[in-house]
């Protein structure tokens, strides 16, 4: 029942890592501070750890991120706004900030060298980053300094203890979740957290591979397991969590979309007719868009109750999307380097320029109305035409 399976092409970080290795020529000939080795092959925890240090081995959870003089083309996995500041995270613990709308970037220290995959800033000062090795980082000053709050080592002990205590107190329904949790960390702490979302400066949630879900009500000082809150008996990979127009959604593999029921506090499954992975959901008060592999887009006009496929001109896997309210437009970016604008009806798609010769991983709108796209070739600014 609890057979572990590979993350495979269902995890965005794996898709991106494979493309990075293919385009960079791999790790073998790269130095430890080179961009090529910085990918660290997210798909393979062994290579992920081996690339961090040659001799002696230092676990990425124990090694601060290497500092670089020039980060303009280092690989980034996600980007977010912290007030007027932009913050991006990437391979091998890279954290970069920009205070001029993405025109220039500077690296800030990170306490780990694990790959960082996602960000959430509920306000201009408080922010969280998550990634490989189950790591959760926190900043209280808008991304200038970071501390580690949680990691896969903590998860293997503290999350299991939480479930075991509740089972011992009589809640036997939690046993399958404890079994899955134990299986997830049987091989060590490398299981990634793929996405994080904070409602405010106290309440947040992170999700990841094999149904992993954790939450906090005290700004990340303590984390508890939340596998049982999600209608996910197969423990599908959970690729993203976030809020759209007041509702909270989780996008997963095998066409699974979960919506938070405010009354019960549980995420209920809406199964689409899509067999692939969704990597995120964006939208507004009127429409939701779920995006996934090979340019896949699904649309809902009833707050996620039902979904239908949209004809899409996109070729690459859609890694990120944003709704730009002033222009009433959606912007999608892909692993094929595409950046495309679509009207709110999703009938008119227009390219924002030639495809970048890199993998796009994220997109953010600045306070000035420009687009900043993160990717494996670094960040780039683009006008919203």
Regions found by a protein language model. Give the residues of each.
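Residue-level hotspots at or immediately adjacent to binding/recognition sites across diverse folds
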Residues: 2, 29-385
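Bacterial N-terminal signal peptides that target proteins for export
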Residues: 2-15
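Residue-identity detector for glycine
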Residues: 8, 25-26
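A periodicity- and composition-biased signal for non-globular, repetitive helical segments
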Residues: 9-10, 18, 36, 281
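Bacterial N-terminal signal peptides
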Residues: 12-24
């Amino acid at each position: 029942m609890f057979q572990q399976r590979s993350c495979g092409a269902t995890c965005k970080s794996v898709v991106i890592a494979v493309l990075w290795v293919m385009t960079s020529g791999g790790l073998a000939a790269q130095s430890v501070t080179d961009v090529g080795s910085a990918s660290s092959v997210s798909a393979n925890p062994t290579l992920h750890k081996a690339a961090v240090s040659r001799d002696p081995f230092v676990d990425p959870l124990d090694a601060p991120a290497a500092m670089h003089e020039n980060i303009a083309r280092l690989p980034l996995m996600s980007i977010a706004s912290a007030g007027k500041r932009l913050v991006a995270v990437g391979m091998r613990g890279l954290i970069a900030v920009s205070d001029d709308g993405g025109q220039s970037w500077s690296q800030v220290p990170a306490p780990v060298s694990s790959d960082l995959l996602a960000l959430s800033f509920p306000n201009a000062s408080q922010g969280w980053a998550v990634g490989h090795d189950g790591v959760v980082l926190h900043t209280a000053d808008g991304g200038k300094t970071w501390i580690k709050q949680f990691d896969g080592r903590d998860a293997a002990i503290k999350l299991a203890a939480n479930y075991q205590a509740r089972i011992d107190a009589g809640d036997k329904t939690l046993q399958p979740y404890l079994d899955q949790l134990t299986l997830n960390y049987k091989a060590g702490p490398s299981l990634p957290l793929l996405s994080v979302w904070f409602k405010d400066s106290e309440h947040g949630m992170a999700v990841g591979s094999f149904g992993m879900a954790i939450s906090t009500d005290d700004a990340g000082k303590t984390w508890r397991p939340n596998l049982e809150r999600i209608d996910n008996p197969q423990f599908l990979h959970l690729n993203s969590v976030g809020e759209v127009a007041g509702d909270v959604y989780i996008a997963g593999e095998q066409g699974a979309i979960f919506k938070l029921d405010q009354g019960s506090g549980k995420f209920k499954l809406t199964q689409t007719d899509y067999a692939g992975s969704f990597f995120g959901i964006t939208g507004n008060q009127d429409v939701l868009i779920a995006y996934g592999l090979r340019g896949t887009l699904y649309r809902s006009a009833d707050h996620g109750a039902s979904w239908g496929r949209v004809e899409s001109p996109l070729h690459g896997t859609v890694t990120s999307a944003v709704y730009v309210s002033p222009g009433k437009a959606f912007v999608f970016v892909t692993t094929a380097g595409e950046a495309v604008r679509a009207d709110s009806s999703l009938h008119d798609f227009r390219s924002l320029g030639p495809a970048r010769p890199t993998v796009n991983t994220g997109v953010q709108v600045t306070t000035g109305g420009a687009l900043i796209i993160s990717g494996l070739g670094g960040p780039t600014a683009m006008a919203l035409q």
